[in-house]
Amino acid sequence: MQRAFPLLLFALAFSSLPAQEYTLTPDSQPQDGVPKGTVTKFVLPPGKYYPGTPHKCAVYVPAQYDATKPTPFMIFLDGSQALGNAMRVPVVFDNLIAKHDLPPMIAIFIDPGILPAVLDADQNRYNRIYEYDSLTPRFAEFLLNELIPEVEKSYNLSKNPDDRGLSGVSTGAVGAFMAAWNRPDQFHRVLSFIGTYVSMKGADALPALVRKTEPKPIRIFMQDGKQDHIVAAEPYGTNFSGSWPINNQVMYEALEFAGYDVKFEMGTGGHDLKQGGADLPDALRWLWRGYPEPIMVHEPAGTGQPGYDAADRVFSTIYVDKPWRQIGGAYGPIFSLTSDAEGNVYFADSRTNAIYRADADGNVTRFSEPPSDIPILRVGTDNRLYAYRPWKDEIVSSNIAADMGSDEKTVAHGLGDVVDFVVMRDGTIYSVNGQSGPRGGIIRIDPSGETHSALRWSDLGAESIMARNLALSPDQSMLIVSDANSHYSWSFQIAADRSLVNGEPFYRLEVPEATVRGFALGAAEDTNGQVYFATPLGIQIAMQNGRIMQILNPPLPGGGPLTAITFAGTANANWIYVAQDGKLFRRHVKVTGANAWTVVKPPKPTL
């Protein structure tokens, strides 16, 4: 109740002000002596992403276009509207390019798709909400793989993401923002007019996601009006999905919190383009200011100031100037990563059946060539490398100083389709199979090699669990089980007799919009008891209390899910390694990873 009163006052303030009169400036009027660009219309035929659905498009080309040079460009959603009198984009571009306020750039206009009805008596299917309101990467992939290549047939478009911008109005603002959010390797500039960041199809959740997620190199201009879906009798909003002014404000605050280069113009108008059209020239100047300087990620403006709360924020884990770096080459799918006390990382290449080692300096060399595929590796406290052999259904160990196969010992066999295992300091091993249903569960292997059924999913009434990874807490008192089948992962207490007890679906992960599954394919812990889950959204970092507090971006935007994760280092385990699309990446971090040979009691969690 304490927050409701201020928000009500906020809403009442919106409804009590008369709408300001907005007029187009000379920058939106044709000017004598200014070179005029050309606009060519075309229809993009149906393709893979929106089957059977054509899109009406147009391309503006400035008079200064030079076909020998890669040209910056912007894509305007609801393209016919952007071409119309409310925005007059070609006129604005002509004037700003002539003033050198914009570089010579192409504008691509695209309308939302309409699936034609089969019969005249039938209704068309209108795709605007499906395309623009979606949080999935589908629309971004459509732009990158269908629209842009079509325009590139005629024009030399830049591939530099700093040269690429997006603009959207209302629901189109969500589409523009999400295309850049999902593919920050492709788009760095966004115009958002009267954005629909409300509960239509999930955009109301974006501010929370923005606050948690490592910032991306995107510059955003936002505009809304205090009477956007607001009337005097309903200052809290007239639409079922929420309040446009409040949600735009919350979105802006989230972007500021995360450290984005963002500007927000809150006017007095409604859900229209009166202010947006008048603001467009200055918005474009702001969006492209400093060009061609690259758009970079920065820490939030309040960093280091008195009262600044740095705990639990992304930059308490990572360095702003130390991004992911690929090491080694291209391999087959990498299903596990493990490290030793010297900071070396080991992984198996499923394509060549070879085991590779990355040293502390990031140099990757072939370590050994076992006779067949070994997907899972773990380093134990006895300086031995443990491996699972699926063709024999056994775990073996070898001296880490020798090739796999020499000095080899069989640890256990008959384990049943193992997808991961962990080795404790006392030599106890927990292995998990990839089966769901009554056959799915965890096996405990004593140091003597004797095996025991430690847990069956059916014992928990959770037969849908599809475990993919195990991790130990830094004090080795808890076993974390990542579940690829839901957005929860489990925490089990390790009893004195090494049985697993008191299991709970403790960690609630964020999931990709296109699925209800979390697809957590890896997990690791730091010495503070925080869990790092490898997921399609990136590395989701859970506080010791179970909350997801940070999400680190994956190395390859638009790539496949992260398939493995580990910490490594020398004096401290201060590197984090992940595998994605058969490639190995690492980055320097501010935290220290937990390992099998050093047992550390984590601090009491925040409650």
Question: How would you describe each model-predicted region?
Answer:
Residues 20-302:
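Non-catalytic cap/lid and distal C-terminal segments of serine-dependent acyl enzymes
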Residues 301-323, 500:
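Blade/loop signatures of beta-propeller domains
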Residues 325-328, 365-370, 406-413, 452-459, ...:
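Beta-propeller fold detector
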Residues 329-344, 370-389, 413-441, 459-478, ...:
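Beta-rich, blade/repeat-based domains predominating
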Residues 344-369:
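Beta-propeller domains
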Residues 350, 390, 434-436, 484, ...:
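Short loop/turn segments immediately following the C-termini of beta-strands
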Residues 399-403, 491-500, 588-597:
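Short loop/turn segments immediately following beta-strands, especially the blade-tip
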Residues 563-607:
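Blade-level signature of beta-propeller repeat domains, shared across WD40, Kelch, NHL, RCC1
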